[in-house]
């Protein structure tokens, strides 16, 4: 890297860290952060700090705020798997998120612990134009813009997923996106999320187990392609 200031970016990963290791190899540095262990990669003329948060909104929000406050990252990223909420969200489809909807309360309160927002809050998530100038990863039906519903409860039943889609207008659901979006919104930090559908509305448990690693890696590959494109 040159003597110029190096851009720092933060990547929050819930449980898909294996895909980072498979795609980028071993990190340039590993050390203990305030809440979570951090891996640093020097790639694309940047320092990329990766925090494995584990599942859940509060963990993801804590990881994002640690990256902002302790590392001084300029933007936040996330890739990972998500559940499909409609018939149109197929296993293997890749979504670049342009809006995150907080859909459930923490501990039944109806208020999101990370920022005190009521359920139903909508956060913009900055889908980048270059995301739509890349080829879909092998086998993916589509790479498209989408809306992410995000909450601390697991939504698995077909009826519950269809109802959530109807209420929120979301395409997919996860358990971390709202925490990351809340941290980004608190300081107007750019936020970029890429999700791959690991389970559709009719996916059974056996299929989910079989598809998880494949779709997590597909999410990473799509994210990495878009990241390369954005640095050109």
Regions found by a protein language model. Give the residues of each.
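N-terminal short beta-loop-beta anion/metal-coordinating cradle
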Residues: 1-65
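Active-site-proximal beta-strand elements of phosphoester/diester hydrolases
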Residues: 48-54, 145-149, 194
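Mid-sequence, gly/pro-rich, charge-dense loop/helix-turn segments that line enzyme active sites
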Residues: 84-168
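Glycine-rich phosphate-binding loop signature in dinucleotide/nucleotide-binding domains
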Residues: 4, 67-74, 187-189
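A C-terminal functional module that forms or caps the active site or interfaces directly
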Residues: 153-202, 210
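Regulatory input/activation interfaces that engage signals or partners
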Residues: 191, 196-232
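Structural motif
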Residues: 10, 74-77
